């Protein structure tokens, strides 16, 4: 992901950026560009909406039930992707945030 601003250089956001609680990271991702190179083609879009999920006490968070095979990525190192399939038709992308061992992630809700 790269910041999207006319007066800021376009750089890859370092993993250290994600080493904070999800509610702090989520609004700062809005306006960033998500880029992927796929089969030699550059695919990109601007992040327009995010949602923060923070810890087992967050009842909307997958980790509310604790550590399971499905939620294990949320407990991992910040800056990694947590991707899952839902409703039998959608793949959802999240950026893992906070310290390793703390289940937190930001859902990329709009691109």
Residue map of PLM features:
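A cross-family signal for N-terminal binding/gating loops and helix N-caps
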Residues: 2-111
């Amino acid at each position: 992901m790269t910041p999207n601003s006319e007066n800021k250089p376009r750089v890859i956001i370092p993993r250290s950026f994600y080493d904070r609680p999800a509610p702090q990271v989520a609004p700062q991702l809005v306006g960033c560009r998500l880029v992927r190179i796929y089969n030699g083609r550059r695919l990109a879009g601007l992040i327009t909406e995010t949602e923060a999920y923070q810890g087992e006490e967050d009842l909307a968070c997958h980790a509310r039930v604790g550590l399971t095979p499905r939620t294990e990525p949320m407990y991992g190192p910040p800056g990694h992707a947590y991707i899952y399939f839902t409703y039998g038709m959608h793949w959802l992308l999240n950026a893992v945030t906070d310290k390793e061992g703390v289940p937190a992630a930001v859902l990329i809700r709009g691109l």
